[in-house]
From Swiss-Prot:
GO terms for cellular component: cytosolic small ribosomal subunit. InterPro entries: KH_dom (IPR004087), KH_dom-like_a/b (IPR015946), KH_dom_type_2 (IPR004044), KH_sf_prok-type (IPR009019), Ribosomal_S3_C_sf (IPR036419), Ribosomal_uS3_bac-typ (IPR005704), Ribosomal_uS3_C (IPR001351), Ribosomal_uS3_CS (IPR018280). Binds the lower part of the 30S subunit head. Binds mRNA in the 70S ribosome, positioning it for translation. One of its GO terms (biological process) is translation. This is Small ribosomal subunit protein uS3. Belongs to the universal ribosomal protein uS3 family. Part of the 30S ribosomal subunit. Forms a tight complex with proteins S10 and S14. Residues 38-106 form the KH type-2 domain. It comes from Lactobacillus gasseri (strain ATCC 33323 / DSM 20243 / BCRC 14619 / CIP 102991 / JCM 1131 / KCTC 3163 / NCIMB 11718 / NCTC 13722 / AM63). NCBIfam families: rpsC_bact. Pfam families: KH_2 (PF07650), Ribosomal_S3_C (PF00189). One of its GO terms (molecular function) is mRNA binding.
Amino acid sequence: MGQKINPNGFRLGVNRDWEAKWYADKNYADTLNEDLRIRKFISEKLADASVSTVEIERAANRINISIHTAKPGMVIGKGGKEVEALRKQLSALTKKNVHINIVEIKKPDLDAKLVGEGIARQLEARIAFRRATRQATQRSMRSGAKGIKVQTAGRLNGADMARREWHTEGSVPLHTLRADIDYAWVEAATTYGQIGVKVWINRGEILPQRKNKPSKKTKGGN
């Protein structure tokens, strides 16, 4: 089961949190559609800012958006002009009070989406897929990853027949729930067609904190 299911959804509530934190009853469809519009707008507006995750939290007429990016300076801009302009545009889009929080990704080579986008950009620049995947996996391992697995699928190197190839380094235990597995799927638009890139990164194990049990008193003890 762990081999087939999305590792991010498989670990929700265990060592991963939801990217959308809100509750809606009758207006669920409208709220979800608004979330999709927000994410699409941010991904198009900040296409070159290495944005990985967008977290949306709602409370009454207020929307809190956390943008995880490897280039916070590009998102914030000089004196905060860029992020303020983005906030106003999102407020106009949603007609709600929007607050934006920028979270820096300190190790982008351990983020599956950013690694996948880097491979996709190289494939679009006609770099050989084996070279692109090998370099990406080596950078991730040097950054502290316990393991990484990359799958590329499509007309690789312009071949007439589409195929699927894997490149793995280290250990990627998909069945182990305590393992911090980051997963992403990205598409590269090449002249030969679309090439899918899937990335799994094992960032180590997250062990639950043990509660200290009260020591049992021995008979006759003080």
